[in-house]
């Protein structure tokens, strides 16, 4: 039974992944549909709950076939969470952490997205960096006034001396504990996020530079399913995938061809695997009759936001991919969406480059020049003449 709590009256229902066309109902109220089965999403269900028994229903429709080129599974295949917060609280995915090197010193920036469902509220935002064992390293704070029934952003910037850097060889991690404390004694809201400190550069001449050193990527593509376990996401299975890659000598992975489970990214953070986090297998031109092409125009903005905002604090992610071997190749049908997608990613996260996999099968690469220009890093599929023959 649901017990109302005056100190934490706001309730959010969070879905990490439902394949597909997930339509959510709370006590008969239709909260809308989320078509893309690989996107995480959430609903504010506060207005629809009542004391006692409540009915939450999710209708899934995976009847439109063929909608993918690999095994998808169906239904609620990733975690579901019920999140209860005070009226003044952090929005879901409301903490963004970036690190950069300034005069050989690490600078940390925390951007907090704060919601206030009540009257104007003075508060203090506390951000504490700890070791994974809980040992406190430093604390920063900022006084804020949250306007009534508004969402606002607050930024904190501070130096982080003697930070241990994250890399595939030394995957050092920290925790950021952010606490919103109202000055009037109202309940505080706390969010804890794991992050790492690393510095990524790239150039045509030097390639990828991680923490000041050139690094070559020994990578592979991994789909979201877990073999005989199907598409259901179990923490141990996600970690096993990452562990097997690490033991086989890989130091990088591309999440083909959609955002992965959160547990897989956690494993990459802890084990030391660099990640290209990929959004879509295609844009407007179809590879299968009912694939993302029928959703693209209406949903790509929200699905990009879901991927970037959810995953941006993972130090393992060094690059965002906006597509895989898309059918569109020439301007304007390829170039305009590429600039729109890449631009939106950069607005959400200017700290990472944007790529996509372009496929010309070693022919006519020059037709890709206008499309390639929309990216920070160009993915060449496939440079077969560069590799050893079977």
Segments from the language model and where they lie:
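Accessory beta-strand-rich segments of carbohydrate-active enzymes
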Residues: 1-93, 117, 132, 259-262, ...
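Short glycine/proline/serine/threonine-rich loop/turn segments at secondary-structure transition edges
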Residues: 8-9, 49-53, 160-175
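Hydrophobic/tyrosine-rich beta-strand signature of extracellular beta-sandwich/beta-rich modules
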Residues: 58, 127, 176-178
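Surface beta-strand/loop "capping" patches
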Residues: 87-119
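N-terminal carbohydrate-binding accessory modules
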Residues: 94-96, 176-247, 266
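Substrate-binding/catalytic cleft of secreted carbohydrate-active enzymes
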Residues: 236, 242-247, 251-390
